[in-house]
């Protein structure tokens, strides 16, 4: 069956061209991630990322573009941050919420345009902060005012370029472009992590490696299971007679995912969690109480236990927040009522909205705890097995992005294949 689908995918000219175009954009992204910003010496950068937990996470998030000091060193961070800010603002400004939820595709396009515009100042600000932190710690050299202005413009343009590539990929119908680019960056780091792990290999660690890979298989299977899990709410449609024909009278269900927010909460939480460490690094070189306070704050947020607890709580918070923004039980209930649908044993309208919200909260609790545990898995796995080099494969952002993106892309490609197969009849 899979062989037939793959064969049809490559036989269909339109789908084949879309797939090849997406692969080409991946290549462009990886090339850009290896083009350094001109005029700045960054020889000590890789060593810094190996030793710094906060920036090491950020480097993984950008697919290694940060350690290469490339023109796209910020990755998709500014765009993701602008999305977080706008979605928070929908809860404060009713007009913005109406634009996002009630004005259809045109409203969402306008909302996305606001996100693009907000990305520009955020990218410039983050670029300036990053350059200043590196310069004050002596990691980069040759940072005069003209070169800094040029570098900030380059970094901002790089962030907008990646955002544009992500949107083009999304338009091809092969998956979410932003998630796919992050996925491509993570996959590109796999050979490097494997090499680093085996370069320090010793026969005494064989039991730890076996335990690690066994645990990895179990964790990945659990991620797939939870990602695909659904809670089906039964829905029936009333019978209606029009002329001599009868409509409705069928039963179906409303699928409710255990993990409706997908990978977004982990990405949001990671973006927020990186800020304290970056700010502490920025002010840590100041003299007096400012530098002392920044250093103390940096040590506080770099503590493994504090970092893990904050990460866990932020993921749970953003799971509920993102689901509240994107999934509205009241709208679901109204749409069901308009189409003549109802949940057996529940009154249509407000009662259905309350019922759906109750089920959603119960399901979401399981999904939020699961996401929180996935976020802190690298520390747990490393503590159990003593193996640290491969933790990127089984924990946090890396694991969930890889699994979620693969499953989502396969789903969208299957939908494209089915649509083309129907057209052939």
Predicted segments with their positions:
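N-terminal cationic and glycine-rich segments that engage phosphates or anionic surfaces
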Residues: 1-425
């Amino acid at each position: 069956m899979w062989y037939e689908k793959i064969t049809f995918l490559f036989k269909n000219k339109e789908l084949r061209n879309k797939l090849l175009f997406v692969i080409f954009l991946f290549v462009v992204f990886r090339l850009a991630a290896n083009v350094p910003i001109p005029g700045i010496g960054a020889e000590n950068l890789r060593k810094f990322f190996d030793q710094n937990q906060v920036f090491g996470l950020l480097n993984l998030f950008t697919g290694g573009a940060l350690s290469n000091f490339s023109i796209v060193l910020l990755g998709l961070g500014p765009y993701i941050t602008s999305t977080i800010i706008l979605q928070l603002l929908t809860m404060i400004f009713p007009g913005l919420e109406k634009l996002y939820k009630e004005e259809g595709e045109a409203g969402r396009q306008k909302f996305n345009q606001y996100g693009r515009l907000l990305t520009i100042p955020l990218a410039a600000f983050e670029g300036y902060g990053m350059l200043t932190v590196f310069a004050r710690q002596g990691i980069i050299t040759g940072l005069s005012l003209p070169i800094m202005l040029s570098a900030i413009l380059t970094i901002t343009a790089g962030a907008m370029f990646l955002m544009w590539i992500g949107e083009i990929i999304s338009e091809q119908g092969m998956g979410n472009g932003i998630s796919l680019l992050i996925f491509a960056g993570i996959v590109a780091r796999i050979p490097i992590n494997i090499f680093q792990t085996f370069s320090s290999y010793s026969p005494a660690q064989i039991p730890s490696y076996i335990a690690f890979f066994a645990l990895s298989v179990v964790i990945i299977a659990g991620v797939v299971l939870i990602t695909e899990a659904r809670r089906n709410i039964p829905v029936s449609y009333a019978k209606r007679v029009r002329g001599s024909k009868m409509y409705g009278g069928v039963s179906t269900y409303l699928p409710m995912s255990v993990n409706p927010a997908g990978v977004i909460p982990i990405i949001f939480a990671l973006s927020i969690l990186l800020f304290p460490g970056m700010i502490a690094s920025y002010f840590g070189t100041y003299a007096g109480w400012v530098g002392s306070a920044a250093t103390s704050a940096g040590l506080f947020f770099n503590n493994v236990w504090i970092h893990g607890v904050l990460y866990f709580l932020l993921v749970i918070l953003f799971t509920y927040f993102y689901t509240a923004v994107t999934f509205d039980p009241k709208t679901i209930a109204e749409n069901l009522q308009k189409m003549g649908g109802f949940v057996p044993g529940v009154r249509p309208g407000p009662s259905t909205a309350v019922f759906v919200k109750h089920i959603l909260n119960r399901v979401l609790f399981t999904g939020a705890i699961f996401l929180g545990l996935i976020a802190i898995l690298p520390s747990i796995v490393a503590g159990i097995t003593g193996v640290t080099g491969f933790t990127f494969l089984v924990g946090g952002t890396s694991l969930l992005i890889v699994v979620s993106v693969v499953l989502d892309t396969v789903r969208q490609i299957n939908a494209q294949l089915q649509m083309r197969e129907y057209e052939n009849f």
